[in-house]
Each structure stands twice: as structure tokens, then as C-alpha cells.
Amino acid sequence: MAKFGEKDEYNVGLMAAYGNARSDSKSSITNYKSSSKIDGYGFGLYGTWFENPTEKTGAYLDTWAMWSKFKNEVSGQDFGTEKYDSSGITASIEAGSSYKFGQSEGVSYWIQPQGQFIYQDVQLNSFKEKSTGTLIDKGKGNIQTRLGAKAFLVVPTDIAASSNYRPYVALNWIYNSEDKLVKLDNSYYGISGNSNLGEIKFGVEGQTSKNSYALFNLSYQMGSNNYSDFIGNIGWKVNF
């Protein structure tokens, strides 16, 4: 951690992560169903600048880059289970500013406009599908742009002097430079309708101690061609 002025602060460090995800999908045309699961880990670097970390107001800039490796499993309705690995780099730069516009009985009210660019280049390792022998190859990298705003409350707790929890709602516009594609032999296939997305997100973030945080959120994304996605996350972070 470094201070460059009377108030501002810059934090840099190393990070490690583990993730697990499950998903189910259904075709609106054929009614075919499929399911998938992913287990992965990653290592990376981060850096964050705060204009006024003591009062939690003003601008911030957050950057990070991570290399990740995943084990993937996909099961189709009329096909067997396919297993494959994927790995690659993800990097992000996010900027925003926090504004406090009220307080009542210890609870403060905030609004935070945000913008973010995410470079996503996690690619699958090429493999042949068991049932058909089709060569499945890597797709294309993506740059995701997000613009939005988050409204939240800061509610102090009695657990510790530095602890609080922050329920919030966020509205975002998300743009993806590339569709989610996979290459089968010499042709690309993917999901259409996710280039421009509207997102609404509800969640709560909790500072359980000076160095630990917990989070939970649910989000719903809507795009063109009847594209929609419902996402939930739960996590815990500790700073050393």
C-alpha cells in the first residue's frame, strides 16, 4: 500500500482464486437440454487507487490481470459427457466515483457510476468429440465493455468497529465485441443476441472485518433474439 497525497491511496498485490460453476440450458427451437460444470483456479496481480479511502468518497480506479485454468464438463440430452480443459488470460480496468447523498440513524445512502473494460481470452484446448469425432477448437477472445450505476446503503454492524454490510441494486449496459463461439471442424457456432445486453443486479456485500469481505448477488441479463441469462454468485475475500 502506498500514499501519494494527503488523502489518496494506492494498493497493489497478488491474488489467487478458486471457482466452481453449474449451468443448465434449453433450446427454444428443439427443446434439447444440456448441462455443464466448471472447476478452476487462477493467479494474478491487482492494483487499486482511491481518491479518499478514509471517507470512502470520490473517484477510484481498479485494475487486475489473472491467468486461469479450468476443467470443464458438458452433458447433452442425446449425447455422452464431454470433458476438456481451458486456460488463458483475463484482465480488467474499472473506474468510477462514489457519492454520498444522505444519512439517517447511522445508515448512509450512496450512488456510484461505473465503467469497465474486460479483456477475456480464456480458450479451450482442442479435442475431438467422442460421439461424432468432430474437432472442437478454440473460439475467439472478447473485449467486454460495461457502463452503469450502483445505488447502495452502508449499514454498520456490531460485529466489529470496521464491519458493515451494503445491500445494493445496479443497472448496466454491457457490450461484447465477440459472440460466445466454438469452432466445430471449420465452422464457428455460438450464441446470438448477447452483443448488447441490459442487466439488473441485486446483491449484498459485507465487510466482516478489517481485511475480509463476503458477497452475494443475483443478476438478470437481456439481449436480442430472446437471449436472457440468470446468474448468481457467492464469495468470500481475505486481504493479507
List PLM regions with ranges.
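Membrane translocator/pore-forming domains, dominated by Gram-negative outer-membrane beta-barrels
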Residues: 1-240
